[in-house]
Structures are given as C-alpha cells and as structure tokens.
Amino acid sequence: MRKAYVTGAGGVVGSHFVEYLKRNGYEVVGSYFTPTTDIAEIDPSIKLFELDVRDHAKMMDWIGEYLPDVIYHFAAQSRPVPSWDDPYYTMEVNVGGTVGLLEAVKAARAAHPGYDPKVIAISSSAIYGDALKNYTVDNLPDETCPLLPLHPYGVSKAAEDLLCYQYYKNFGIQAIRIRLFNCTGKNKDQDITGDFAKRAVELSRIGGNVLRVGNLSAKRAILDVRDLCSALLILDQKGAAGEAYNICSSHIFPMTHVVECLEQVTGIHFVLERDPKLFRPADEPLYAGNCDKIKALGWVEKYQYTDTIEATYQYWKRKLA
C-alpha cells in the first residue's frame, strides 16, 4: 500500500483529497495547523495531526519517521489580500514551510538509502501575474508563461515553485510543481461559488430573491475540486519529476453563468443588485490556463459547473440547517 502524507489537510482541497486518496487505496496521514474547513467532517479513520510547517525540526522528525512514498504539499497562507497585510507571515509559511519540507526529505533520503519519495507541491497561477494580460481565450498561458506575480502571495508561490525545481536539479528530489487556477469545492465559502450558494440558502429561507453582486462580466474557468483530486492522483502515477503542470478547468464562462446555474439549482429567479463593495480594484477580464500537458497524461475533467454549484448549495443547505 502506497503511503501518502498531505500537508494542509484542513483546507478545502486537502480535506477532499485525503478522503480521495483513501478511496483509491492509499495509506493516508494528513497534518493541519489553522484549518479553513471543519475537520470534524473528514473521515475519522484518516489519521490527522497538528503540525505548523514553520516548525522545521518537527517536520524533519515526522518525515524521517513516517517515510511517505508521496507528499502532497498544500499547507499555505493562500489568500492575496492577507499577504499585503502581513507579508512576513506569508513568506514564513509558504517559502519557509516549503524549504523545511524539502530539507526534511533531503535528510530522510540521506539517512535511508533507496528512499526517494515524490513531492507534489501545489503552487498557484498567481505566479504568472501580470503576464496573463497578454493571453486570450484562443491563446491561453501554458507552463512557459513568464512568472510576474503582482502580490506577496504570488511571489511566495513563485518561490515555492522555483525551490522545488532547485531541489530537483541540485539534490535529485522528485519534486513536481502544480500551478493551480481557480478551483472550488462544496465547503469553500470565500469565493463566488460558495458565497452565492450560502446567500441563496439564506434567501430561500426568508422568501427573498435579491442577490448582491460585483463584476459579472469577467470570464473565469472554475475547476471542481473532485476533478482536481483526480489530476493530483495522476501526477503521482505518471507525473515527471522537475516538471510544472497547469491545472485548470477547460470550461470558460462569464460570471453571469454562476447566477444562471444557481437559479437552475434553486428554482429562484434572482434580482441582481450591484454592490460596489464586491467590485475589485483590479479584476482580470479573463483568468484561465492551458492544461494540455496534464491532459496528455490521461486526465479528463468530468464535472460541469452546474454539478459544482449544486453540490455547494446542498452542502450549505445542510450546514446552515
């Protein structure tokens, strides 16, 4: 049985992925520090423990003791806005935490001849930053896109990405870099899918139909976390060490489609009210990426956005009951 260790198991992706790995025959252990989801909802048979990735000594001890076959590194300060407020913390977690993990793997390989785990680090499309303005729907950015991050979070993820490449080139660590575009899951609440779904539940209970919105003209590709899980599994099976892979939905649509899908799921015809507070100072008209590289490994996207928002709406309907 292949042993997997997942950092950031208390996050949206991590909480889904530990269960997905178990269903696919892995022995799974996950760590968390400041969960952004309710970890009580995770399958209780999966071992979870608390670990701050900034605690390099504890990480060193854990990797050397457990010797996982594959490590999925999700743990991060993962929001751009807080990265402006506290760039020090963002760098300590995202950059320092990655260095600590890679150093732990390097030490374990030295102490245990023949031990050679895969390290799959989840970076972000935010590393492309300002370069994305040069692309169109007919010419989406692939993994050769320049790295021009526009905020401390993006810079920290670019550093994580490049550190993995450096440890691969210099020490032979089987590091794979994931450049993840927009992704959502049923238990994520701080994005348009979760926010709209939660408010739709609240409106349904009071007979309301006024939905406050921001910019709905922007085009996005929003991946279902269940499709992300299958992509990450394929990378353990077939991904090449040292390589970077974009992961993004191939379904690109304006944000008006979110409202249309929510109306289909809820049966509510929403009256849209523009709220200046929901508009971003800078909002990219298009945010999507080219995923031909991972598709060549056999990854197939299965879920439509309607499936995603229905699962999210039903989740918050139960959660807020």
Predicted segment positions?
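Catalytic helix-loop patch of NAD(P)-dependent Rossmann-fold dehydrogenases
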Residues: 85, 92-100, 115-118, 126-177, ...
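Amphipathic terminal alpha-helices
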Residues: 2-3, 306-321
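Rossmann-fold cofactor-recognition segment
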Residues: 43-54
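N-terminal Rossmann NAD(P)H-binding glycine-rich loop of SDR-like oxidoreductase domains
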Residues: 4-22
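Non-catalytic, hydrophobic alpha-helical segments
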Residues: 228, 232, 247, 258, ...
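C-terminal "lid/loop" region of Rossmann-like NAD(P)-dependent oxidoreductases
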Residues: 210-211, 215, 242-245, 254-260, ...
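NAD(P)-dependent short-chain dehydrogenase/reductase
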Residues: 131-138, 162-221, 225-234, 252, ...
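NAD(P)H-binding glycine-rich loop region in Rossmannoid oxidoreductase-like domains
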Residues: 53-93
